[in-house]
């Protein structure tokens, strides 16, 4: 059983499950687990690991349109190098600082491989969930895609400095808050853009929902062109690799310009909500992306 199937089965037993965060009153709460073998390529330093691990949970808070308040992390490793632990905590604190949250503590434990579990807390009276996309809405994204794929390529080429730089990202908390009054549905792109589009369609309350996506409108990170020569690899990096932590959301067409003006992060319109599945340039868009328990996962 892969991650997707396991989560689907668990969600069926938990009322309200399926969004990027759990909602408890006016608070949103999320937790993530990352492992050395699946989430931190060779060359990732502990500063970047701390930044990225805590940032992943803060990105979930952003996807709900919530103000980020606090985060904690549990750090497991076969042994504790004081310098590595210090660098990890520095990364965790600084990514919190970047979004106006507070890093408030955590735990240390011996573990067979480097493993991190993070939890983040946010606050909003009106969270944006995944299920509100309606036909006619614009399909939008923040930022650009393929940065994490480019980071992996840099690590593979023996350039850890560039790889670590690309692997650190700023969670889109400010954009999420700004977009909250306009977005009908929203999530982050941790599983990849293609998979995120399918997830928004699956969650939609509209009858027989779908999306028509214009592939040329998808913003691609400059590092993708820098590190990938093959056009097919560039497409794979932007659409399917995942772990870019951008926001993927829908907005009524008549609110699009106001939403774009409100966001502190550039917003691109990549398509339209319609019916009959997810398509790009008229062809079905494969439902696959990043997943634990087997890297890229295929939806069937």
Regions found by a protein language model. Give the residues of each.
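Short amphipathic alpha-helices in soluble, non-transmembrane regions
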Residues: 88, 135, 256-268
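N-terminal glycine-rich phosphate/pyrophosphate-binding loops that anchor nucleotide-derived ligands
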Residues: 1-55, 59-62, 101, 285, ...
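Acidic, Ser/Thr/Pro-rich beta/coil linker or hinge segments at domain junctions
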Residues: 260-300
